[in-house]
């Protein structure tokens, strides 16, 4: 705000009058929703108010008040900044400064967010030459009041100094840098309607560079100039209108400048457009899908327009480089170009051929504006007959089966909408958001991310990322089978019903239509049906139980199916969100793969033989550590079979080395080390057992910002708890070796205390979880052998959640035998193996479930 004295009664009256007029306009917009009328009306209202203040300040007629930026073009969003320039003559009285300052202060007092500058014409030109942002703002300058002659002199000087080529280069670079800030995708969970790729700023950038080049300042003028077609101009106007309306509604809903379509506002924004929730889709998901389609269209058309403007500003010095396909395609300056605009109409099969050539031709880095435009205008050609054409089906399979370039080809096919035209069910999931707190990409982007992940396994340059996956895919015959499965694994999302079952039918039909038969077709369909199975077994079941492995091996059946499912599962989890995958999940999946492979190879999943094997391996490791030969017996004699099945040989050896001298320790033994699998800390606790032990340990982790990934709890025959935890530090980067000693000391001290369990901290939910809460679920049932009870908990993730659960269990003196903590983005699906007297009592079960639901409630 201005630094001058408090507003006068007259200023307050003007402010109230301005606010009332603006409020009336916003109310009309709420009902009529004509965004162009609103923006122009707000601009005129602001013009009139500033003129009155200008006159009241007695500023001389030799000055000019100029609107710049969006205000300059007469487009004010409800709470946009009002950018103004006070234009001074070259010779001016320094005494004017006080009056200009008073004018700016009074403008602020109107309630406007003023962005002001005071310059001479020469200063404007100098600033513009040094800063493309200033140059852009001045491009749309409009006189509000004051000297017409001075403003015209400024306009002439500005355009004389404007270098259209340099301006084009600077604005395109600026756009690329802006896109990079948004990860080069319009498919953000919370897109910025103005700044994100495919947003309003892209449309403005095109009009700026066109205006600077003298090609026109509206879509109609660019159409007349031949830079776009009449159809493209209509599409641009339609999507621009939607984006402007959406931005204005965000401002009105928020009551302030708000260009980010944040979770908190998505539902209200959707309702303002008339969207209503259905059984299959939230109102917000319907709005977001419309937004993504608009942003996608803007991105496509912007690419075409920028290439066309570039071609006019920078005429090519060389023409055709080489002919790629007779009567169809040439390479022109590294871009694939059709020989004339009628190629796709004469040869519909050339549409997919374009992507095959892009994929397979070295030196071709993209599609030219002419080719992109022809694709954009060929939507009617891509009909049922085109989809059924055997030539097109063969070309599509060739694209899938190339040794390289597949990911880029499919991304480009999606960007140009060709993929959705060829696979109609894929079109249904383009731009479909998944508010499941797990996926952070739209369904189509997730599918392409999974395809990309599988492809990276096969690329030598990326073999270091997941060497085991790269090794497996290197020996996997016909890996394109995996690519087809990736395309269809989530294609039925959002239809209602089981998407795996519905996707199977789509995959089966695709195989039949594309000549995929026998085991390849069977494997593709099976993968779509079971694409969630391996992650569910690895993350939610006790894989130390031979029966679990035996059942999973029966589902898989053979090594090829197991390898295919493993590769798809890793790629799928990694393609949901950068936060979901971690090395611990990778180890769970790899361990499940290896033990299942052994069973498929004839190994008997027998607990006794597995126990003997692990003990022998552990003893060999202990000998390397110079532990006396019989030193392990005192500890091992107190451990049950379950302990040896839940830990691998290296882990058994480490725990034995730590504890063999302390089997009857009077105080807690706590040891911590960086987890052998990386990115985590392994914490061992050995202490006399008590009912609240697990809860007490969880309380310590909660208070110190450590998240539990896995807990393996054992009770010795002589009453000691031997518990192992894998924990991560969630809030910051940390070297686990540096905090290991601190954890050992603090946790041992905590366990020596007799204080009652503290109240759980009710940590704040993320904005995503607050906006899209999931219904918490608790399920308690006996395991198949009746030995333990399995507790399943599903809820929004938040700090203190695990401890809240553990505390309820401790209050009922229920022991936790094992815990599998499965964090999926913003939600958790935790599994606990419980033991305790009375768990078979239905009344206790109901009471326990009720208290747990209360404890995990948001």
From Swiss-Prot:
Keyword RNA-binding: no
Gene3D superfamilies, per the entry: 3.30.70.260, Hypothetical protein af1432, Nucleotidyltransferases domain 2
Highest taxon above the source species: Bacteria
Any one GO molecular-function label of the UniProt entry: phosphoric diester hydrolase activity
Domain ACT: from-to ranges: 682-763, 790-858
Residue segments, region Uridylyl-removing: 325-681
Reaction catalyzed: [protein-PII]-L-tyrosine + UTP = [protein-PII]-uridylyl-L-tyrosine + diphosphate; [protein-PII]-uridylyl-L-tyrosine + H2O = [protein-PII]-L-tyrosine + UMP + H(+)
Ranges in a coiled coil: none
Region Uridylyltransferase, annotated ranges: 1-324
Keywords (A to Z) from UniProt: Hydrolase, Magnesium, Multifunctional enzyme, Nucleotidyltransferase, Repeat, Transferase
Activity regulation behaviour: Uridylyltransferase (UTase) activity is inhibited by glutamine, while glutamine activates uridylyl-removing (UR) activity.
The protein's required cofactors: Mg(2+)
Enzyme Commission (EC) number: 2.7.7.59, 3.1.4.-
SUPFAM superfamilies registered for this protein in UniProt: ACT-like, HD-domain/PDEase-like, Nucleotidyltransferase, Nucleotidyltransferase substrate binding subunit/domain
A Pfam family per the record: HD
InterPro entries reported in the protein's UniProt record: ACT-like_dom_sf (IPR045865), ACT_dom (IPR002912), HD/PDEase_dom (IPR003607), HD_domain (IPR006674), NT_sf (IPR043519), PII_UdlTrfase/GS_AdlTrfase (IPR013546), Polymerase_NTP_transf_dom (IPR002934), UTase/UR (IPR010043)
Tagged with keyword Magnesium: yes
Biological process per Gene Ontology, one example term: regulation of nitrogen utilization
Membership in a protein family: Belongs to the GlnD family.
UniProt free text on domains: Has four distinct domains: an N-terminal nucleotidyltransferase (NT) domain responsible for UTase activity, a central HD domain that encodes UR activity, and two C-terminal ACT domains that seem to have a role in glutamine sensing.
Function in brief: Modifies, by uridylylation and deuridylylation, the PII regulatory proteins (GlnB and homologs), in response to the nitrogen status of the cell that GlnD senses through the glutamine level. Under low glutamine levels, catalyzes the conversion of the PII proteins and UTP to PII-UMP and PPi, while under higher glutamine levels, GlnD hydrolyzes PII-UMP to PII and UMP (deuridylylation). Thus, controls uridylylation state and activity of the PII proteins, and plays an important role in the regulation of nitrogen assimilation and metabolism.
Protein name in the entry: Bifunctional uridylyltransferase/uridylyl-removing enzyme
Species assigned in the record: Burkholderia orbicola (strain AU 1054)
Lineage: Bacteria, Pseudomonadati, Pseudomonadota, Betaproteobacteria, Burkholderiales
């Amino acid at each position: 705000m201005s630094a001058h004295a408090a507003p006068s009664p007259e200023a307050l009256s003007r402010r109230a009058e301005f606010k009332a007029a603006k409020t009336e306009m916003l109310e009309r917009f709420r009902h009529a929703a004509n965004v162009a009328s609103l923006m122009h009306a707000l601009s005129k209202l602001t013009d009139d108010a500033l003129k009155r203040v200008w006159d009241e300040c007695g500023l001389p007629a030799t000055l000019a008040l100029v609107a710049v930026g969006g205000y300059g073009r007469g487009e004010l969003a409800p709470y946009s900044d009002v950018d103004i320039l006070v234009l001074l003559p070259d010779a001016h009285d320094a005494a004017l400064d006080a009056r200009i300052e008073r004018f700016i202060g009074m403008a602020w007092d109107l309630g406007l967010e003023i962005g002001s500058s005071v310059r001479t014409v020469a200063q404007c030109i100098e600033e513009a030459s040094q800063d493309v942002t200033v140059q852009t703002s001045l491009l749309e300058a409009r006189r509000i009041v004051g000297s017409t002659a001075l403003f015209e002199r400024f306009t002439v000087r500005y355009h004389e100094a404007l270098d259209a080529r340099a301006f084009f280069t600077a604005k395109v670079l600026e756009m690329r840098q802006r896109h990079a800030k948004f990860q080069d995708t319009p498919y953000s969970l919370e897109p910025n309607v103005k700044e994100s790729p495919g947003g309003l700023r892209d449309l403005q950038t095109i009009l700026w560079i066109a205006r600077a080049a003298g090609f026109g300042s509206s879509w109609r003028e660019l159409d007349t100039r031949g830079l776009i077609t009449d159809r493209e101009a209509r599409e641009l106007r339609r999507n621009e209108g939607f984006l402007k309306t959406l931005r204005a509604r965000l401002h009105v809903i928020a009551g302030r400048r708000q260009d980010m379509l944040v979770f908190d506002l998505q539902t209200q924004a959707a309702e303002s457009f008339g969207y209503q929730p259905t059984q299959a889709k939230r109102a917000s998901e319907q709005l977001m899908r419309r937004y993504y389609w608009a942003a996608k269209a803007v991105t496509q058309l912007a690419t075409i327009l920028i290439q066309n403007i570039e071609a006019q500003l920078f005429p090519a010095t060389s023409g055709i480089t080489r002919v790629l396909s007779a009567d169809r395609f040439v390479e022109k300056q590294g871009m694939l170009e059709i020989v004339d605009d009628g190629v796709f109409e004469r040869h519909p099969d050339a549409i997919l051929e374009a992507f095959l050539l892009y994929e397979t031709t070295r030196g071709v880095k993209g599609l030219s504006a002419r080719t992109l435009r022809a694709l954009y205008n060929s939507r009617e050609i891509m009909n049922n007959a085109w989809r059924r054409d055997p030539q097109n089906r063969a070309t599509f399979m060739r694209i899938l089966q190339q040794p390289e370039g597949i990911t880029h080809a499919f991304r480009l096919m999606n960007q140009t909408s060709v993929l959705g035209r060829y696979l109609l069910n894929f079109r249904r999931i383009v731009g479909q958001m998944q508010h499941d707190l797990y996926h952070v990409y739209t369904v189509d982007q997730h599918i392409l991310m999974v395809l990309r992940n599988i492809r990276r396994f096969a690329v030598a340059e990326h073999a270091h990322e997941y060497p085991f996956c790269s090794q497996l895919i290197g020996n996997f015959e016909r890996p394109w089978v995996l690519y087809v499965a990736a395309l269809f694994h989530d294609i039925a999302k959002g239809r209602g019903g089981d998407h795996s079952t519905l996707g199977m039918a789509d995959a089966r039909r695709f195989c039949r239509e594309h000549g995929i038969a026998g085991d390849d077709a069977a494997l593709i369909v099976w993968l779509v049906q079971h694409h969630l199975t391996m992650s569910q077994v690895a993350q939610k079941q006790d894989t130390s139980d031979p029966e679990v492995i035996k059942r999973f091996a029966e589902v898989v059946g053979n090594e090829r199916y197991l390898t295919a499912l493993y590769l798809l599962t890793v790629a799928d989890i990694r393609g949901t969100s950068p936060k979901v995958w971690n090395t611990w999940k990778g180890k769970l999946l790899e361990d499940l793969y290896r033990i299942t492979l052994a069973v498929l190879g004839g190994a008997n999943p027998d607990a006794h033989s597995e126990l003997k094997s692990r003990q022998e391996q552990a003893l060999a490791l202990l000998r390397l550590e110079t532990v006396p030969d019989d030193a392990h017996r005192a500890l091992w004699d107190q451990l049950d079979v379950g302990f040896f099945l839940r830990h691998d040989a290296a882990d058994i050896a480490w725990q034995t080395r730590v504890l063999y001298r302390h089997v009857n320790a009077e105080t807690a033994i706590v040891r911590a080390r960086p987890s052998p699998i990386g990115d985590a800390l392994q914490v061992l606790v050995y202490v006399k057992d008590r009912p609240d032990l697990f809860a007490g340990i969880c309380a310590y982790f909660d208070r110190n910002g450590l998240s539990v990934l896995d807990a393996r709890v054992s009770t010795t025959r002589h009453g000691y708890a031997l518990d192992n935890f894998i924990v991560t530090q969630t809030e910051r980067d940390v070297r686990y070796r540096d905090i290991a000693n601190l954890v050992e000391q603090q946790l041992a001290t905590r366990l020596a205390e007799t204080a009652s369990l503290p109240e759980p901290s009710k940590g704040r939910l993320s904005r995503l979880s607050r906006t899209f809460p999931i219904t918490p679920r608790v399920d308690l049932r006996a395991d198949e052998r009746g030995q333990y009870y399995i507790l399943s908990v599903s809820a929004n993730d938040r700090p203190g959640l695990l401890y809240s659960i553990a505390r309820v269990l401790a209050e009922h003196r229920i022991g936790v035998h094992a815990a599998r903590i499965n964090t999926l983005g913003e939600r958790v699906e935790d599994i606990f193996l419980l033991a305790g007297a009375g768990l078979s009592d239905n009344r206790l079960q109901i009471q326990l479930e009720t208290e747990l639901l209360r404890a995990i409630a948001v």
